Amino acid sequence: MHEVYDKWHIISRDSYNYDHEQIEFTEIDHIVFTGMGGSGTIGDVFSSILSKTNIHVSVVRGYLLPNTVDSNSLIVNTSISGNTVETLNILDSAKKKNCKVIAISSGGKMEDYCKKYNVNFRKIPQYHSPRASFAGFMYSLLKILGPILPIKQVEIKESITELSKLQSRIHSGNLLDDNLSLNLAHKINGIPLIYYPHGLNAAATRFKNSLQENAKLHSMVEDVVETCHNGLVGWERPSSIKPILLQGDDDFIKTKERWKIIKEYFQEKNIEYDEIHSLKGNILTKLICLIYQLDYSTIYCAAISKIDPSPIHAIDFVKQRL
C-alpha cells in the first residue's frame, strides 16, 4: 500500500492533466455526491469547495436520494470499485427521477449499467484499493467537474505542489524525526477522538475511517464547537480515549476561542492531547494535504503494531452476505 501513497503527488498530477471529458450540464441548483467510504470523502471535499457558491450540495452515504432532487439536480455517483451496492441503487433512482447524472468508477457493475442505459460515465483506474485510490479519483473529478467548480486551476496546481513537498517529508523512505506522519503514529493510542472545526470535517472523517481500516482501531470524530455543548462532559470520567485536535490555519475567530478553552480544560484535567495543524492555502490544499498526512500516519500506525493495513476482513464478511 505504501508504494501507492509514495506516488500520490504523481498520481494527482497525472490524473488532473489527463484529457478527461468535462461535463456540459447547465442550470444546476443542487449537486448530490453519492458514495461510501473513500468515495464519500470525495463528496465531503467537494462540499467544502462548493460551500461558498449558491449551489445546494448534499453528500449521501447510503441507499436513498433526497426527495428534493429534480431535473435541475446533478447526481455525482462515485464507486471506486464500481460494485458498491448503495451507490448503484442511487444511480438507478437518479436515472428514474430524470436527474442529471454522471457516474465514475474503475469499472464493475457501474460501468455495465451506464453502458446499458446510456448514462454519462468516466472510467478511472484503481490503485491497490479504493481508499488508496482517493487521490486519482479526486483529481480526475476536479477536471471532469471543472466547468461548475469555483476553484481556480492555479489553486489545484498549488495543491499538487504542496502535496509533493509533503511527500518528501512523510514518504516510506524517510523514517527520521522530521516525518510528521510517523511522529503522529507513535502517539496514537487508546481510542482516538478527533476534534475538528467547520471546513475540515472531510479530513477528520477520512482520518477516522483510515484508522479503522488501516490500523484496525476504533476512532471517533466530533465538531469542536458542538462538543462544547455535550461531548466535553464525557471527560469528567476517566477514559482510554485520546483527544486529537485537528485545527485549521484560518479557523473562524470564535472557533479559535473554543480551541483555546478546550486546551485549557484538558490541561487542568491532566488529559494528554495531540495537535495537528493544516497548511496555509486554499481549502483544497488544506484538505488534500491533511488527508495525505493523516492517511500515512495510519499506515505507519499499522506497521508499528505489526499489522498489515491492506486486508479488511470485517468488510469482506458483510459483502459476502449481501
Question: Which residues make up each language-model segment?
Answer:
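Conserved, well-structured ligand/cofactor-binding cores
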Residues: 2-25, 66, 157, 274, ...
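Active-site phosphate/pyrophosphate-binding segments
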Residues: 2-4, 10, 19-23, 27-30, ...
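Conserved active-site and cofactor/substrate-binding residues in soluble primary-metabolism enzymes
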Residues: 3, 7, 41, 45, ...
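Short helix-capping/linker segments at secondary-structure and domain boundaries
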Residues: 17-18, 54, 144-154, 215-217, ...
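Glycine-rich phosphate-binding loops that contact phosphosugars or nucleotide phosphates
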Residues: 26-168, 186, 248-274
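A generic structural motif
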Residues: 59-62, 217-228, 272-281
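C-terminal active-site/capping subdomain that shapes the small-molecule cofactor and substrate pocket
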Residues: 233-313
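A short, charged, Gly/Pro-tolerant segment at domain boundaries
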Residues: 311-322
